[in-house]
């Protein structure tokens, strides 16, 4: 069995990489992938703590997060396709559709 500290360390490392991608990158696709990395790192920690405390609720919550993430990705990719068709760019700074 893998020690809990290794799983937490993996989750924290993935979370830091994902947060860095969300905060530092300007490409919307990279930001979306970094957000997915953030959510998957949280899932790793849910499953690790559920396994450590011998409780299945961590796995169930991780499945719910995966389902919500799949819906979020579907909506975000639809918006991304419409954005590329209208603006021909994926840069966050160039997108000013909501600006009034």
UniProtKB/Swiss-Prot annotation:
GO terms for cellular component: NADH dehydrogenase complex; plasma membrane. One of its GO terms (biological process) is ATP synthesis coupled electron transport. Pfam families: Oxidored_q2 (PF00420). It catalyses: a quinone + NADH + 5 H(+)(in) = a quinol + NAD(+) + 4 H(+)(out). Signal peptide: none annotated. It is a multi-pass membrane protein. GO terms for molecular function: NADH:ubiquinone reductase (non-electrogenic) activity; quinone binding. It comes from the Bacteria. Belongs to the complex I subunit 4L family. NCBIfam families: PRK05715.1-2, PRK05715.1-3, PRK05715.1-5. NDH-1 is composed of 14 different subunits. Subunits NuoA, H, J, K, L, M, N constitute the membrane sector of the complex. This is NADH-quinone oxidoreductase subunit K 2. The gene is nuoK2.
